[in-house]
């Protein structure tokens, strides 16, 4: 069994009715609902406004993968939270950063850059390589997969 934690700011869903209509249980709830189809996964959620941003040493202890969705409140994430997540990533926990998470404190710290980016929208095919095929979250995946119509991102 793999333990996955889905972290979300959970602000857009509270502040914007259109987003709330799309994600009545939050983006984290939508991702959890999809992943829950796999009975071999233990899935928990955490959000920005929870105590300690919903992240504790105990919660991360057995976590195999942390999915991180951030967009507009990166600066509100506590340094304590970033330190805990960084330590667990360095110990082997997987981190999947979604959407505008490239500007999250944890992603910038792990990448060692400001993570500013440039992009183009030409509908090109993107190939994503599995870097750690032995990680439980990668079980059953081919060495890579392709997305047919994607935006391309790069660091300037």
PLM regions: where:
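Short alpha-beta junction capping motif
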Residues: 60-105
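A generic local structural motif
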Residues: 52-55, 82-83, 150-151
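Conserved short-loop catalytic and cofactor-binding motifs
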Residues: 15, 19, 73, 125
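An acidic, glycine-rich "communication" segment
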Residues: 98-156
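Aromatic-Pro/Gly-enriched surface loop or interdomain linker
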Residues: 1-62
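Glycine-rich, phosphate-binding/catalytic loops in enzymes
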Residues: 22-24, 82-86, 107, 112-114
């Amino acid at each position: 069994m793999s333990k996955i934690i889905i972290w979300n700011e959970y602000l857009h869903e509270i502040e914007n009715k259109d987003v709330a209509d799309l994600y009545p249980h939050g983006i984290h709830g939508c991702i959890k609902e999809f992943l829950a189809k796999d009975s071999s996964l233990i899935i928990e959620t955490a959000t920005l406004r929870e105590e300690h941003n919903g992240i504790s040493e105990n919660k991360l202890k057995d976590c195999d993968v942390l999915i991180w969705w951030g967009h507009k409140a990166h600066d509100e994430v506590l340094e304590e939270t970033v330190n805990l997540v960084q330590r667990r990533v360095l110990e082997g926990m997987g981190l999947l950063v979604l959407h505008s998470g490239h500007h999250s404190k944890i992603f910038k710290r792990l990448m060692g850059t400001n993570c500013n980016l440039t992009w183009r929208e030409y509908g090109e095919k993107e190939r994503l390589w599995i870097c750690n095929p032995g990680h439980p979250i990668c079980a059953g995946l081919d060495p890579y997969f392709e997305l047919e119509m994607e935006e391309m991102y790069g660091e300037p």
